[in-house]
Amino acid sequence: MTNIRKSHPLIKIINHSFIDLPTPSNISAWWNFGSLLGVCLTLQIITGLFLAMHYTADTMTAFSSVTHICRDVNYGWMIRYAHANGASMFFILLYFHIGRGIYYGSYTFMETWNIGVILLFLVMATAFMGYVLPWGQMSFWGATVITNLLSAIPYIGPTLVEWIWGGFSVDKATLTRFFAFHFILPFIITAMVMIHLLFLHETGSNNPSGLNSDSDKIPFHPYYTIKDILGLLLMLLVLLMLILFSPDLLGDPDNYTPANPLNTPPHIKPEWYFLFAYAILRSIPNKLGGVLALAFSILILMLFPTLHTSKQRSMSFRPMSQCLLWILVANLIILTWIGGQPVEYPFITIGQLASMSYFCIILILMPMMSFMENKFLKW
């Protein structure tokens, strides 16, 4: 008789995805982030569901409902901070996951990669709308500034912004629809994750060498399940330290002041994980130009398969390209720092230089370096 996990229609799918899945024998800890992101998404949906039970999406009561969750609900403070810091954790893992994909050339799986970029957009949209819900000062002004960017779109811009707001400013209608979208998007993300995995399992995983590993595969369980559990424990350790010791470390103090349309905070800035894109947006003096640069700073990821000029897939044996990638990482850290600084000298100049080098490294220097390395292979 066949094993139930191989014959049952539902269990069979799980078996092919997580148990008997043939996996390269040499994948490193950098391949842990996918499963960690899955756990993170699950945690966010669960904590979000419990928060939604007590939250009210109304401008008059939103702020006080969040206060009520933290003060009066059993372990409400923990659920709230787990959700807020879980989002930060999500983005940390997401950026590591994308970085791994760039380093090891995983972007050559075109469908998987492009769905991943769409997933990044969806997660960013969800996080942005979630940040608006507590209805603090930074929630309100962040929503005002970011939605206002759409007014830069020629002809339809201003109408589009008013349509999104549901009025002539960010108000009750905006908060209600943002809550609705914030609730539904994680489920759309979950569906997209399944498609992401479907396409990944069509080709099989990449590995650090970038070579075909069909001749050397091992079952996913128990080898990688146990390896993923180690990663999970480390992630939970970091997350719990954040939640229990310094829950407000990554937040903005301004968001503890209720939203006031008559009082603008001195520095309007998004959450830390959007600061690099915010710095790119601010580095261009023209509104439409800034919006295009902001969109392209993420969309540029879709160009990686096209810009790949190297004869080797992975960067494991390409020290010059490695060097460039680490310069890009340093550049992104500088952009993140600049995004949180006021718009004044010298930060404006640093931001403009960092934004320019971000696009130069990806569009010009990396393909050129790969081309040069191909030449060195012939020596």
Curated annotation (Swiss-Prot):
Assembly, per entry: The cytochrome bc1 complex contains 11 subunits: 3 respiratory subunits (MT-CYB, CYC1 and UQCRFS1), 2 core proteins (UQCRC1 and UQCRC2) and 6 low-molecular weight proteins (UQCRH/QCR6, UQCRB/QCR7, UQCRQ/QCR8, UQCR10/QCR9, UQCR11/QCR10 and a cleavage product of UQCRFS1). This cytochrome bc1 complex then forms a dimer.
Q: Which GO terms describe its cellular component?
A: mitochondrial inner membrane; respiratory chain complex III
Has the keyword Electron transport been applied to this entry?
yes
Name under which the protein is recorded: Cytochrome b
Residues given in the record as a ubiquinone binding sites: H201
Carries keyword Transmembrane?
Answer: yes
**Which CDD domains does this UniProt record tie to the protein?**
cytochrome_b_C (cd00290), Cytochrome_b_N (cd00284)
Classification from the root reads: Eukaryota, Metazoa, Chordata, Craniata, Vertebrata
Q: What more does the entry say?
A: Heme 1 (or BL or b562) is low-potential and absorbs at about 562 nm, and heme 2 (or BH or b566) is high-potential and absorbs at about 566 nm.
Which parts of the sequence bind heme b b562? H83, H182
Gene behind the chain: MT-CYB
The membrane topology term of the UniProt record is:
Multi-pass membrane protein
Please explain the role this protein plays, according to its UniProt record.
Answer: Component of the ubiquinol-cytochrome c reductase complex (complex III or cytochrome b-c1 complex) that is part of the mitochondrial respiratory chain. The b-c1 complex mediates electron transfer from ubiquinol to cytochrome c. Contributes to the generation of a proton gradient across the mitochondrial membrane that is then used for ATP synthesis.
